[in-house]
Structures are given as C-alpha cells and as structure tokens.
C-alpha cells in the first residue's frame, strides 16, 4: 500500500455562528480540497466555558459543529491563510497524517 503525506484540519464552530455553509462553499468551490466532512456535536464548550448542548426543551439550536478536511500540506497551508482571516483564533487545529493512494 502506497501512502502520501496530507494535513488534516478541524474547524470548530457553533450553529449560532451561521458560518457552516460559507465554510463548506469556500472549501469545495473556492479551494477544491480533497475531502470535507461536517459533524454536529451533541454537547461541548469552548474557552468561554459556556455549554452548548441539545435538550428536549430547547427550540433554538446552538450546537457545536466540527468541519474536518484534508489535502496535501502545501494546499492546506494556502487554505489556512485565508481561513484564519474569518474563523475565530483558536478554532482551527491541524496535524500531519498519511493517506493511502493504492498499491
């Protein structure tokens, strides 16, 4: 199995930020990254300590969202330069990974 180096990135948002569609469009249309997945959390909190969670009594949803994507390190570096201009500091995490590319 052949492997290639990639960079994985996670972007942490909340539904209340209303930035999910903008982020997905940016990653898909503008940057054409290799793979993107969005996850909705059932609970979470950030630096503020304010809990974001779903309950049966809540009508408004402000749940945590995680958008994960990967691509070649050079491309991710370019994407992060643009992304860091409109995503709150401390809400983007990245790390090196390996992706299988066949035999």
Question: What is each model feature region?
Answer:
Residues 1-103:
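Positively charged, small/polar-rich N-terminal and surface patches that mediate targeting and assembly
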């Amino acid at each position: 199995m052949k492997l290639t180096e990639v960079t994985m990135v996670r972007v942490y948002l909340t539904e209340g930020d209303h930035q999910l569609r903008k982020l997905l469009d940016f990653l898909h249309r503008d940057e054409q990254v290799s793979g993107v997945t969005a996850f909705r959390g059932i609970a979470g909190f950030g630096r503020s300590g304010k809990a974001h969670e779903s309950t049966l009594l809540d009508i408004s949803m402000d749940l945590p969202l995680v958008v994960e994507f990967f691509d070649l390190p050079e491309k991710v570096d370019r994407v992060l330069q643009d992304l860091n201009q409109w995503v709150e500091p401390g809400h983007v995490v990245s790390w090196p990974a390996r992706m299988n590319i066949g035999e």
